[in-house]
């Protein structure tokens, strides 16, 4: 037992003790009286600043990035109006770099291999969208599925992009080219063929092609025009840095109104498609193909349920449940969401790049005339598109030289040991980059030169690991073949119907970042 060397005897009375005790209480009271609301607020603010910095230091670890974070907001202002050269500086700073905006910690991968690792790590990451996306696309939209559910849903869409399916969409695609090229010529003539901006027209053309391909003629020309005009607001609402709430007259508010309009139009189209296909109509668009697959699955399941004999040939390649009009609209909306900005950017660059290189435009024109045997009105077919080797090379080089989507945000689902020494924390955003891979001099010599021949006489086709334009892994772009065929057909048809020139400005080669990349002016 421990010995206690002490006494329980009360200390002797000491007249000096009591006044000292009262003096301390008075001091505490004075401090509390001086501790105003504003002082308390300032104390909390400085404590929050310190916490924010310490959290940033912890998450940053050995990653390349700013030594300190601007309290709370980080580089928010730069994120609101992103500049391409700022992204380029990040890529050049290291294989992995970081930044923190408000509560979001962001890791940016700059090399091909690091980007591919992220794309191919579904156990650790999933595609990341801004908070408002759930309100615009619908909280139960398939794009928010993950893992097995996502894989199974995609299987039901794969049949919409087979060679035979794509062939059935060509007539409505060519119809759009013919209509809009006639309009382009009339518009240019009305302006006395003077230089003018054409990006809005290219956006509308691509929107029209997408809508006609997705929903055929179930939608009016006026509705397509409305979607083309308003889709810009959806893009603005889905920028990475934006308000997570829908407040009146904000980008999110305007974007929600536009998305509701698109979903209503697509829902009406779905009802019409169901009636058309149930009556034995032919497939003319993606919606028709998907509705028919659903109806075929329903017929097969009904026979099985009744115990009727069914030939193996009658079983659909992938059994689908029946989707409501709204569910079909949501899915088709995601196809528009995935394609509109990217194809608009590619279309704009394509027209500008070939205009700046008349020899390239002339080769495209010669090839398209030759494969049509001199008949510029020969209808598009898959076989015809297959013969356009040079036109395809121009499209592939455009996508490499100016990849529409330069980065793809992912959310870290659980701590991600991306290297032996770096683990990205759960909840962080991690971004594989496309641009550095498509401008890697080891894969593409003189990467900053536009050279379509690298896809014919060079070995660019062998650099598949670097061509990350459509992603890779479980979330690769479903419509990558369709997107490229669309661009090949579009520029080929344009070369036969029109001639065009580009009046360069000092900023023509500068890059504007708005969801995708466009020429600055």
UniProtKB/Swiss-Prot annotation:
Membrane topology per record: Single-pass membrane protein
GO terms (BP aspect): ergosterol biosynthetic process
Pfam families: p450 (PF00067)
SUPFAM superfamilies: Cytochrome P450 (SSF48264)
Gene3D superfamilies listed in its UniProt record: Cytochrome P450
Residues that span the membrane, as ranges: 30-50
GO cellular component terms, A-Z: endoplasmic reticulum membrane
Pathway: Steroid metabolism; ergosterol biosynthesis
Keywords associated with the record: Endoplasmic reticulum, Heme, Iron, Lipid biosynthesis, Lipid metabolism, Membrane, Metal-binding, Monooxygenase, Oxidoreductase, Steroid biosynthesis, Steroid metabolism, Sterol biosynthesis, Sterol metabolism, Transmembrane, Transmembrane helix
Database matches in CDD domains: CYP61_CYP710
Entry EC number(s): 1.14.19.41
Entries under InterPro entries matching the protein: Cyt_P450 (IPR001128), Cyt_P450_CS (IPR017972), Cyt_P450_E_grp-I (IPR002401), Cyt_P450_sf (IPR036396)
Catalytic activity of the protein: 5-dehydroepisterol + NADPH + O2 + H(+) = ergosta-5,7,22,24(28)-tetraen-3beta-ol + NADP(+) + 2 H2O
Location within or outside the cell: Endoplasmic reticulum membrane
Cofactor(s) demanded: heme
Additional notes on this entry: In Aspergillus, the biosynthesis pathway of the sterol precursors leading to the prevalent sterol ergosterol differs from yeast. The ring system of lanosterol in S.cerevisiae is firstly demethylised in three enzymatic steps leading to the intermediate zymosterol and secondly a methyl group is added to zymosterol by the sterol 24-C-methyltransferase to form fecosterol. In Aspergillus, lanosterol is firstly transmethylated by the sterol 24-C-methyltransferase leading to the intermediate eburicol and secondly demethylated in three steps to form fecosterol.
Family label: Belongs to the cytochrome P450 family.
Record function comment: The third module or late pathway involves the ergosterol synthesis itself through consecutive reactions that mainly occur in the endoplasmic reticulum (ER) membrane. Firstly, the squalene synthase erg9 catalyzes the condensation of 2 farnesyl pyrophosphate moieties to form squalene, which is the precursor of all steroids.
Protein name per UniProt: C-22 sterol desaturase erg5
């Amino acid at each position: 037992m421990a010995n206690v060397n002490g006494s329980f005897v009360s200390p002797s009375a000491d007249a000096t003790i009591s006044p000292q005790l009262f003096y301390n209480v008075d001091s505490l009271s004075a401090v509390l009286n001086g501790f105003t609301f504003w002082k308390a607020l300032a104390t909390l603010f400085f404590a929050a600043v310190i916490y924010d910095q310490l959290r940033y230091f912890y998450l940053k670890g050995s990653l390349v990035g700013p030594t300190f974070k601007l309290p709370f907001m980080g580089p928010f202002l730069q994120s609101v109006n992103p500049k391409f050269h700022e992204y380029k500086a990040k890529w050049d700073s290291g294989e992995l770099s970081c930044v923190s905006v408000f509560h979001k910690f962001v890791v940016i991968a700059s090399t091909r291999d690091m980007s591919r690792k992220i794309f191919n790590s579904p156990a650790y990451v999933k595609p990341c969208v801004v908070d408002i996306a759930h309100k615009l696309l619908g909280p139960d939209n398939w794009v928010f599925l993950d893992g097995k559910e996502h894989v199974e849903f995609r299987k039901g869409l794969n049949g919409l992009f087979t060679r035979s399916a794509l062939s059935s969409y060509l007539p409505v695609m060519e119809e759009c080219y013919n209509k809009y090229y006639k309009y382009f010529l009339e518009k240019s003539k009305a302006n006395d063929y003077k230089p003018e901006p054409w990006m809005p027209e290219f956006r509308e053309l691509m929107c029209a092609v997408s809508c006609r391909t997705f929903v055929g003629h179930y939608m009016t020309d006026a509705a397509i025009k409305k979607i083309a005009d308003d889709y810009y607001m959806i893009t603005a609402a889905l920028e990475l840095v934006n308000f997570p709430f829908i407040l009146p007259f904000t980008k999110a508010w305007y974007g929600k109104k536009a998305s509701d309009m698109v979903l209503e139009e697509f829902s009406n189209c779905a009802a019409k498609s169901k009636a058309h296909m149930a009556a034995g109509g032919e497939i003319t668009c993606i919606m028709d193909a998907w509705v028919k697959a659903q109806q075929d699955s329903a017929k097969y399941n009904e026979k099985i349920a009744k115990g009727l004999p069914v030939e193996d040939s009658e079983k659909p390649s992938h059994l689908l449940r029946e989707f409501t009009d709204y569910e079909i609209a949501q899915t088709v909306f995601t196809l528009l969401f995935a394609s509109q900005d990217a194809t608009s950017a590619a279309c704009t660059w394509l027209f500008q790049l070939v205009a700046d290189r008349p020899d390239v435009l002339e080769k495209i024109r010669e090839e398209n005339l030759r494969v049509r045997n001199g008949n510029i009105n020969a209808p598009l077919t898959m076989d015809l598109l297959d013969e356009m080797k040079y036109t395809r090379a121009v499209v592939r080089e455009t996508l490499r030289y100016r990849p529409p989507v330069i980065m793809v945000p992912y959310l870290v689902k659980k701590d991600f040991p991306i290297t032996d020494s770096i683990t990205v924390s759960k909840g962080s955003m991690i971004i594989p980059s496309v641009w550095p891979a498509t401008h890697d001099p080891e894969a593409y010599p003189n990467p900053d030169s536009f050279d379509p021949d690298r896809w014919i006489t060079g070995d660019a086709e062998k650099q598949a690991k670097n061509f990350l334009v459509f992603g890779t892994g479980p979330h690769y772009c479903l419509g990558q073949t369709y997107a490229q065929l669309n661009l090949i057909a579009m520029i080929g048809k344009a070369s036969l119907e029109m001639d065009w020139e580009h009046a360069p400005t000092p900023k023509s080669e500068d890059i504007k970042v708005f969801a995708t990349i466009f020429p600055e002016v």
